[in-house]
Amino acid sequence: MRNASGFLKTAGAPLVSATWLPPSPPPAMPMVAAGPQMERVDNGSQGAPQLFLTSALARGVSGVFVWTALLLTGHQIYSHLRSYTVPREQRFVIRLLFIVPIYAFDSWLSLLLLGGHPYYVYFDSVRDCYEAFVIYSFLTLCFQYLGGESAIMAEIRGKPIRSSCFYGTCCLRGMSYSITFLRFCKQATLQFCIVKPVMALITIILQAFDKYHDGDFNIHSGYLYVTLVYNASVSLALYALFLFYFATRDLLRPFEPVLKFLTIKAIIFLSFWQGMLLAILERCGVIPEVQAVDGTRVGAGTLAAGYQNFLICIEMLFASLALRYAFPSQVYSEKKNSPAPPAPMQSISSGLKETISPQDIVQDAIHNFSPAYQQYTQQSTHEAPGPGQGGHPSPSTHPGPASGSGGGKKSRNIEKRMLIPSEDL
């Protein structure tokens, strides 16, 4: 017999009461919070794909390209130092060649140290500072090719500046070339040599206080303001370099400047616009916001900088090949074997020490930014090489910059001050 509670009851037996117990649920599994922690667990799991930039393939490929570029450029620098016959030119040529080792090795180290801590900021600061050094060195090399400021003024003084939107001279309509024009070209490149190290120092300080994040264009982040100042400064320097080439391209033609100019501009411009493109891709979400590298979280800006460094490692091999053709050492080795070499030979260590010394840059900056600039200009003069000495031909005959007594005497490098007429100021 069944009672209301659902229990059976037999005759003569006491009623046993009980409550209905539902079946017990299975033991609960430990919960994992969703969000960044879950992302980190997933990314750190064995089945997750490895980030390409930290893979052995990326590091191996970039290393092969970097060390090949270092060997090629190192041999070229050594060849110039072995034939250091024209110091006033080769000093700047070697400085230009050093862009490959500095760019390539800095980028490779940044790639190897890619992780939670943005070590690349420190390496990129060194690389970017040398970029300013390269722009100045190339402009000064062109000045040396042509014999100095006064020799250049003897050729272009008073000529009207052709207005052209393509060459960026449309705003100079009605103006003529003067010493003020040359001074602007020098000042515009020198200001980048000053601004870039200052901005690099500011970047390191902001990074230490967690106020600088690559690719973060927030108004409260230092990246926005550093980028604006840097872009304005490098654009002005490259514009001045282009203006000078536009004004003197006929004079520079014997020195085959096109390949030199395009190679230097390509190295600087390519890395500049490449970085800007990666920053835009990061802002558009193409580069993921967060990735896990060796268990640490890496922002999208750091990843964009990592891709930039990887591409620079690859590109520097092609840059080293282009520089071998743009700045060959054979023209100087021929002078070394001539009966009357243009200058006494120096040891390799002395030539290298002269090349890396920034003393001439400091002196040039003081000279070009000095209020007394309008009273004089600096000109590098040398005796013209005698017959059979080889070397670059002179673009024209000047009364002042080139003089000498023939090939029997050794050429001398003379630094002097030359007065400029007041009507040229």
UniProtKB/Swiss-Prot annotation:
Expressed in vascular cells (at protein level). Residues 392-402 have a biased composition (Low complexity). The chain crosses the membrane at residues 51-71, 96-116, 133-153, 189-209, 226-246, 261-281, 303-323. Residues 375-425 are annotated as: Disordered. It is a multi-pass membrane protein. Belongs to the TMEM184 family. Acts as a heparin receptor in vascular cells. May be involved in vesicle transport in exocrine cells and Sertoli cells. The gene is Tmem184a. The keyword Cytoplasm applies. The keyword Signal does not apply. Keywords: Cell membrane, Cytoplasm, Cytoplasmic vesicle, Endosome, Membrane, Transmembrane, Transmembrane helix. One of its GO terms (molecular function) is heparin binding. One of its GO terms (cellular component) is endosome. GO terms for biological process: germ-line sex determination; regulation of protein localization; regulation of secretion. It comes from Rattus norvegicus. It is found in: Cell membrane; Cytoplasm, Perinuclear region; Early endosome membrane; Endosome. This is Transmembrane protein 184A.
